[in-house]
A protein has these predicted regions:
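Acidic, Gly/Ser/Thr-rich repeat motifs that build Ca2+-stabilized beta-propeller blades
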Residues: 1-173
Length: 173
């Protein structure tokens, strides 16, 4: 059996809370680039050995670490920039899609009292979420964006807004 020597080397430093890694070819280029999206709302790509900013939507992202009353705040949060997808014809049309938790949409939470499930008491399990219009943690959105010919990204339209009951388990690419 042939022995294979494998090693790792960092390709980027100081990228906090990465949530998505994707590759694509930018319009007008011929080299595939690695894109890194962060939970905080920054999207970077690596080009020519240098990390560059593709898009910064931190001002559009909900303030992480803020929760409804009754939820312990340990600093852990699963909201933020959760998804990045490039259109199959991104090279030609410049379309891409973002999924993120919207700034300013912090709600009161899904339940009027703290949720304390007890595995020995079936009445405390599988609670139903009754009033989605007023009792929610935040709103997630899916948006279509376009990369313009000048290299700047611009939002085209909102495709979906969803009220989420909790700050966690909101999905990632």
């Amino acid at each position: 059996m042939t022995k294979v020597k494998v090693s790792l080397r960092p390709i980027v430093h100081n990228v906090n809370l990465p949530t998505v890694l994707k590759t694509t070819i930018l319009p007008g280029e011929s080299t595939e680039r690695l894109f890194i999206a962060t939970q905080l709302g920054e999207i970077f790509y690596i080009g020519d050995g240098v990390i560059k900013t593709f898009l910064d939507i931190r001002h559009l992202i909900i303030k992480l670490g803020t929760f409804e009353e009754g939820v312990s705040s340990s600093g852990y949060d699963e909201r933020g920039l959760l998804g990045l997808a490039f259109h199959p014809q991104f090279y030609q049309n410049g379309l891409f899609y973002l999924h993120y938790s919207v700034a300013g949409t912090q709600g009161p939470g899904a339940f009027s009292e703290q949720f304390k499930p007890n595995p020995c008491d079936p009445k405390t399990l599988n609670l139903k979420w009754f009033n989605r219009n007023t009792q929610y943690d935040h709103i997630d959105t899916v948006e279509e964006w376009t990369l313009q010919s000048n290299g700047q990204a611009q939002k085209r339209r909102t495709l979906l807004n969803v009220r989420r009951p909790f700050f966690n388990h909101n999905g990632v690419n």
